[in-house]
From Swiss-Prot:
InterPro entries: Kinase-like_dom_sf, NEK_Ser/Thr_kinase, Prot_kinase_dom, Ser/Thr_kinase_AS. This is Serine/threonine-protein kinase US3 homolog. GO terms for biological process: symbiont-mediated perturbation of host apoptosis; symbiont-mediated perturbation of host chromatin organization. Belongs to the protein kinase superfamily. Ser/Thr protein kinase family. Its EC number is 2.7.11.1. It comes from Cercopithecine herpesvirus 9 (strain DHV). Phosphorylated by UL13 homolog; this phosphorylation regulates subsequent phosphorylation of UL31 and UL34 homologs by US3. Autophosphorylated. ATP binds at F55, T56, P57, G58, A59, E60, G61, F62, T63, K78. It catalyses: L-seryl-[protein] + ATP = O-phospho-L-seryl-[protein] + ADP + H(+); L-threonyl-[protein] + ATP = O-phospho-L-threonyl-[protein] + ADP + H(+).
């Protein structure tokens, strides 16, 4: 199917659900968002799709659950007006891996770039929300898929920069993919850290990215560690702001990570020019000995194989985090079936 023709059609049809999503926004902002969403939807319908559902608007634009009118295939269409959507399309056209979201096609409409993507049953965030706990083998199967995706990206000089539960799509624990490449950075020098700009999500970003220090592929390893922790605790958040932290910003987030980990001054990255070293090393006081279990492990009773993996991935110094390839060789993954069976079969 060719999705590459420009569409020149407009209408004013709109899901009423989006009004509920925007209930807390300023009235003028809501009106503008509704108008822009209606334009995106009109272009999608002109391109030969029927919109089934409008998802909550994101930073890059709008996402719709759709059905292709001729084939009756269920798809997801992302419609964005920012550079991240174009970047995502370019990256997805040039990569191919079983656990990375597949780009089925693209089209443009007015100022929108639209990506046609396969539809999965849910994302990992909602998957965890629907369950009180999941089996360790399921967690490790999902994490293995995420690490395989990250390994492939890093080998192709791409840093995802926004690995999180909301960007991991799942049909079942053996059918998982990493998506949403709007924050991705390429091409990168995987052998040398550099500041590629701010991107991602504060709650899941690595300390060096939060500090605006030079960074590299290890930022994805940190975020994947947060994902594994959330699976192990079934949605608990390790480094979310608490009642004492006020508004969540990078400075507060770094201090929260340092406090909850109990980072010893000797565990800071050895770089006199780095913000983490220059500003935060001197403010940290801890009785924890360097190289011992992080302070947060005292609050959770995690299986040792999961705790060990998470601690390795959440090393405060990026140079101490293993690569995705190295992590996949850890003993925790040895007994996980590959391919992982579909529990409904």
């Amino acid at each position: 199917m060719n999705y590459d023709d420009d569409c020149l059609y407009e209408d004013k049809h709109m899901d009423t659900d989006i009004y509920d999503m925007l209930a807390d926004e300023d009235t003028s902002d809501v009106d503008n968002t509704l108008a822009v969403c209606a334009t995106a939807r009109a272009g999608i319908e002109k391109a030969g799709f029927s919109v089934l559902e409008t998802f909550t608007p994101g930073a890059e634009g709008f996402t719709f659950a759709c059905i292709e009118n001729k084939t009756r295939e269920n798809v997801v269409i992302k419609a964005g007006q920012r550079g991240g959507t174009v970047t995502e399309a370019h990256i997805l056209r040039n990569i191919n891996h079983p656990v990375i979201i597949r780009l089925m096609g693209t089209f443009t409409y007015n100022s929108f770039t639209c990506l046609v993507l396969p539809r999965y049953k849910t994302d990992l965030y909602c998957y965890l929300s629907d369950r009180r706990r999941i089996a360790i083998c399921d967690m490790l199967s999902i994490e293995r898929s995420v690490l395989r995706a990250i390994q492939y990206l890093h080998e192709n000089r791409i840093i995802h920069r926004d690995v999180k539960a909301e960007n991991i799509f799942i049909n079942h624990p053996g059918d998982v993919c990493l998506g949403d490449f709007g924050a991705a950075c390429y091409p990168v020098d995987i052998t040398q850290n550099k500041y590629y700009g701010w991107a991602g999500t504060i709650a899941t970003n690595a300390p060096e990215l939060l500090a605006r220090d030079p960074y590299g592929p290890a930022v994805d390893i940190w975020s994947a560690g947060i994902v594994l922790f959330e699976m192990a605790t079934c949605h608990d958040s390790l480094f979310e702001k608490d009642g004492l932290d006020g508004d969540c910003d990078s400075d507060r987030q770094i201090k929260l990570i340092i406090r909850r980990t109990g980072v010893h001054p000797s565990e800071f990255p050895i770089d006199a020019q780095a913000t983490l070293d220059e500003i935060y090393r001197t403010c940290q006081k801890t009785s924890r000995k360097p190289g011992t279990r992080p302070t947060w492990t005292n609050l959770y009773e995690l299986p040792l194989e999961l705790e060990y993996l998470i601690c390795k991935m959440l090393a405060f110094d990026a140079h101490k985090r293993p690569s995705a390839k190295a992590l996949l060789d850890f003993a925790a993954f040895y007994d996980i079936p590959d391919p992982y069976p579909n529990p409904t079969n």
